Amino acid sequence: MRIFLLFLFWILASQVQAQEIEARAYSNAPIGINFASVGIGQASSGNYKLTTEAASFTRIFDAWGQSGKVSLVLPYAELTGTGKLGSQTINASSEGLSDPLIKASVNLYGAPALNLDQFKNYQQDLIIGASLAASIPWGQYSSQQMLNVGANRWFIQPGLGASKAVGPWRFELAGAATIYTSNNSFLGGNTLSQNPIYSTQTHAIYYFPNTAWLSADATYYFGGQTFLNGTPVGGQQENWRFGATFSYPIDPRNSIRIYGSTGAYSRTNNSYDLIGISWQFRWGGGM
């Protein structure tokens, strides 16, 4: 029973956000540009669905001569579903603000800080960058509920990545470690803790002449042994996921993005499917 609860809590309240596949995480853009986006995504596992509407803001800045960016994501989520555990019916019904995410990344090599006019002559070769993300436990959470859209714990996620340009192609490789604090108000007055999850992801991105792009995505992650009051439960995670992302520019300021991914292998049977769409608007930086 406890393993079942931990599995659902972890995959639907934590894993989807922490292990998101993100193409073009390390790329260059003109200094001073702002991006605002809104979107909707749905993760499903068995009879359970987590639908998330999110708004985000990103700003590009000069980081010691290289470009950097800072992003804030505000998600709102609805968790629904019904399942069986023996003769017991397990209902999921939770809705509200999910945990906000803040992320900063700095390019260390190959992405000079350029204004809009200078950027028109920029040609990418090799970019190397670093990032740090954190999830803030402000989401809807009740220790009396089995499942929640908030995790009631922090995570921080340092990462490193590289992007190599070959003609119209971009080949990316990135790695990260997701480190969790404990949830001291888990169901029944228990304490839930988890070891770090280590992940790597890779992308092959093709750019079309109109700047639309299509990415084939893959990620592998492992670790994340869970503990209930210090006792190991649930087993160590090991997962492969594959997906695709397509971005299309409507005009110089607006674009849409469609994405999807699916679990190809899961050591502990905690795979899920994810689909979503978002709209992005950009301004500033002399546009």
Residues of each region from the PLM?
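Outer-membrane beta-barrel biogenesis signature
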Residues: 17-39, 110-124, 284-287
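Outer-membrane beta-barrel channels and translocator barrels
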Residues: 31, 43, 62-66, 109-111, ...
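Outer-membrane beta-barrel architecture
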Residues: 31-37, 65-73, 99-101, 119-131, ...
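Residues that define the transmembrane beta-barrel architecture of outer-membrane proteins
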Residues: 32-34, 47-55, 95-102, 126, ...
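Transmembrane beta-barrel strands of outer-membrane/channel proteins
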Residues: 36-42, 70-78, 128-136, 173-179, ...
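Residues on the lipid-exposed face of transmembrane beta-strands in outer-membrane beta-barrel proteins
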Residues: 38-40, 55-59, 102-108, 132, ...
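Outer-membrane pore/translocation modules
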Residues: 78-193, 235
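Outer membrane beta-barrel transmembrane domains
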Residues: 190-287
